Amino acid sequence: MKKNFVIICAAVFISNSSAAQGLLNKSEVVFTKQDSLRGSITKEREWWDVKYYHLDIKVNPKDSTITGSNTIKYQVVQEYDRMQIDLQNPLEIYKVIQDGVELEYNREGNVFFIELVALQKPDAVKELTVFYGGKPKVAVNPPWDGGITWKKDSNGNPFIASSCQGLGASVWWPNKDHMYDEVESMLISVNVPGNLTNVSNGRLLSVKKLRDGTKTFNWYVSNPINNYGVNINIGDYVSFSEKYKGEKGDLDWGGKYLEVKGSAARLGKRDHSFTGGAEIIDTLEALQLDTNR
């Protein structure tokens, strides 16, 4: 019986394998030039190593637009004078400035090629600023379908979030959109209406209230980060912070409630959104200690 079962399984496997091979032969994957520009380490990418980003943007819930700039600091690895920056349609780059000079550029689909004024010398550290804006792609079924979510909470306040692991971060901000080169640190400055809060990556450095009634939240990431990991989460959030007794001393950690405020009393009630957080950190610290032994 066992022998017959094995023979039957083998026959089914061979049959399915042949069918699958036939399907592959009939529908070969065709890569476009855009696929190659997006997925490969092009000449316009390989000559520079990204060191730092300052993403400085205004998010407007009224018209679903994002406008602002990204300052890119980079180290020259090879001599070259043309840079690839990725930004997906329908967003546009308005201008690129380096050392006070407006640079020329041309667009090829979701890729911008920036013409630098002179050959970049190896080991030099330079920077330029890309100004951009428009209405980014709307996420239809996040996080599986990437883009920006523009919704409202139960109180009618805007609820906005980015999701881009599949599509890439260039769906909402200009960058070197390839995972082989992670930026080493980053400042994320997000301007929002005064009644809202933006939660991004890293540590909150400051909140600046402006005369027009808006607020800018400045978040700093001090460690390498993938482009697609950079995010905005904008809504009517309540913040809190706690001290955690770590293996090597106290750690301060904070979070943002995922529910709307409702009232100031919620801070006193604590809706337990982060129940289990300390236990998670306990586990991670224990794993790290085991790894270092």
Where do the PLM segments sit?
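Bacterial Sec-dependent N-terminal signal peptides
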Residues: 1-26
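A surface-exposed beta-strand-loop module
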Residues: 23-24, 88-151, 212
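Hydrophobic helix-coil surface modules that form long, contiguous segments used
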Residues: 68, 177-293
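Beta-strand-rich interaction surfaces with strong enrichment in secreted/lumenal proteins
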Residues: 55-58, 72, 101-104, 115-120, ...
